[in-house]
Every structure is written in structure tokens, then in C-alpha cells.
Amino acid sequence: MSSTTSIDSIPATAVFPSVSMPVTVVLTGVLLFVIFAGFFSLFLWQFLLNRLFTTWNLQRTPYGDLIHVATPPENTGLDPFIIRSFPVFHYSSATKKNHGTECAICLSEFSDEDTVRLITVCRHPFHSNCIDLWFELHKTCPVCRCELDPGMIGSGRLESFHNTVTITIQDINHDEENPPTAGSSKRLIEASAWRFSRSHSTGHFMVKTTDANVKSKRRHYQTGSCVSFDELTRYEGAGWQWLGDSSHISRIEV
């Protein structure tokens, strides 16, 4: 009887100790974090697998062959031989600085010690380093977009040859307007089927007459080459005209 009383007198808290509230909250949070991390890992792994298989399928043709990656395009720049044909000079050697005072690529004004390259097709000057970098990816003038591609220039020359005829030059000993003088003669230049030629950069025209007889006193045709800016400006002021080649000029001298 006494033993039964002693067992009943033991408090229930001693057999089943109570768990505090903070511990319960911490355990619940850890459990939720583990569940969330597991679902997130599964979702991320599935996404990566789908991305990998999609990329692999896109690289294969319906016949099972791999699609080869396209090779990068070839160099689309101007031929170095054409670039070297444009004259290079020091800006200090230019007596007439009327071809431009700044580089259109770097927008810096030319100084006397700068090395300038002149595009003789359209007469636009640039720093040599700037225009050389430009020509690595382009075939046109940065200012006027004049086509400098050798194929285009060649086709233009070929067309010009088809549009011209042979010039016949003959000596004559008399003239209806002026009597002949001793030691002098005149030449009759006959030309036909000549067309207009125009500079696409400046818009200037050079009109060639059709079925015209041109008379001149002892005129002769000269060609030459120049490599300095002074020669370019002197020839330009004296009436020299550019023929197709960028390194040669020609004129009709009286």
C-alpha cells in the first residue's frame, strides 16, 4: 500500500519533461529549409539538363550529323597594295592646307609633325594610322563613302574604255581664221561619243564634248607621278587632272 502511494506521488513532469518553445521553432525552421533546398536542387538540376539537351539537339541535323559552326567572315578590308598607293606625307610639307585641317576619324586637327595619308580618289586627308585601321574593315572613304574596292574601280575603268573612241591627231598647215606662220603648226583633235564624268565625292562635272573638233596650238599630253603633297597641290593648281590610277596625274598644257 505504501509502494503504490509512493509511485502515485511522483510528479508527471519528471517522467515526460516538457520541450521549450525556442527549440521547437528552430527544429521546424531547419526542417523547412531542408525541404526547400531539396526541391530547389531538383528544379535546378532539371533546368540544367533541359538546357544541355536543347543545346545538343540544336547542334545536330535531322540526319544526326553535327552542325558545324560557321567560320568567321574573311577580311573585308581594302587591299594593302591599294592602301600603299595613296601618298603619305608630313603635314608640315603642305603649303596649301585647303584639303582639310582635321582628321575625320579621330576628329583631331592636323599638326605639322603628323603623318597624313591622302586618298587621291576623293582628295580627303587622314592620319596615316587612323586611315590604315579604317581600311582593315572598310573599302570606302570615311567621309564621302567613295568606293575604293579594286573590283569596283576596275569595272569603272573597263566601262570608261568602252565609252570612248580612238582620238585621231593630225597636223594641218592652214587655218581659215588665221594665216599660217613660219615654224608653227596646228593640230586637229577629233573626238566623238564621249560622256560625262563626275566626281561622286564633290559633285563636280567634267564635260566632254560630243562630235566636237578641238583646235589647239602645239598642245601636248603629259603624264607623271607624284609622291609629295607639294607636288599634288602644284599640279592641281597648274591644271593637272587625275586619270583612273590614284598615283598618276595628267594634264593638257598649252
UniProtKB/Swiss-Prot annotation:
Stretches annotated zinc finger (RING-type): 103-145
Ranges that cross the membrane: 25-45
Pathway annotation: Protein modification; protein ubiquitination
Catalytic activity line of the entry: S-ubiquitinyl-[E2 ubiquitin-conjugating enzyme]-L-cysteine + [acceptor protein]-L-lysine = [E2 ubiquitin-conjugating enzyme]-L-cysteine + N(6)-ubiquitinyl-[acceptor protein]-L-lysine
CDD domains for this protein: RING-H2_PA-TM-RING (cd16454)
Entry GO terms, CC: membrane
EC id: 2.3.2.27
Protein localization: Membrane
Membrane topology note: Single-pass membrane protein
Top-level lineage group: Eukaryota
GO BP annotations, alphabetical order: protein ubiquitination
Major subcellular location class: membrane
Gene Ontology MF: a single term: zinc ion binding
InterPro entries for this protein: RING-H2_zinc_finger, Znf_RING, Znf_RING/FYVE/PHD
Keywords: Membrane, Metal-binding, Transferase, Transmembrane, Transmembrane helix, Ubl conjugation pathway, Zinc, Zinc-finger
Similarity annotation: Belongs to the RING-type zinc finger family. ATL subfamily.
Recorded domain comment: The RING-type zinc finger domain mediates binding to an E2 ubiquitin-conjugating enzyme.
UniProt-recorded name of the protein: RING-H2 finger protein ATL28
Gene expressing this chain: ATL28
